[in-house]
Regions:
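Substrate-binding cleft of carbohydrate-active enzyme catalytic domains
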Residues: 1-131
Length: 131
């Protein structure tokens, strides 16, 4: 991801390699659909950019490849900016009309219910509207 180079580790497909894979698949009538797991399964992005995590996770070690069930903070504008950049770049690479965003195994009770920023957003979103 060009705008966020810390997201790229030592083992990755180049954009040229992805183009070859997509072309190979298309020749066999297979559509390659990219997947970006959010808001869970995000240890790699949190290891690179820990400020995108919930407030209570600041002191938790984030090592790529480990499952620690941490999530991106839902009330952090920087999360949305980074993911817009990622989605824009991925969309340009893949001809598919679809991007799979995951959404599974997001353990809210261990993350958003303990995060001060997320709690603030939840309270604002659940305020009763006047009759």
């Amino acid at each position: 991801i060009k705008k966020h180079p810390k997201l790229v580790g030592k083992d990755y497909y180049t954009q040229e390699q992805l183009a070859e894979i997509i072309q190979y698949a298309a020749q066999r009538n297979i559509e390659v659909i990219p997947e970006l797991d959010i808001p869970g399964h995000t240890v790699a992005i949190l290891a690179a950019y820990p400020e995108l995590g919930c407030t209570h996770t600041d002191t938790i070690a984030k090592n790529v490849g480990e499952t620690v069930n941490l999530m991106l903070c839902a009330n952090n504008e920087k999360v949305y900016e980074v993911y817009k950049d990622i989605i824009d770049e991925v969309s340009a690479l893949f001809p598919s009309r679809y991007i799979h965003l995951g959404g599974d195994e997001a353990i809210i009770e261990k993350n958003w219910t303990k995060c001060e920023r997320c709690q603030k957003m939840m309270k604002e979103l659940t305020k009763r509207l006047p009759n």
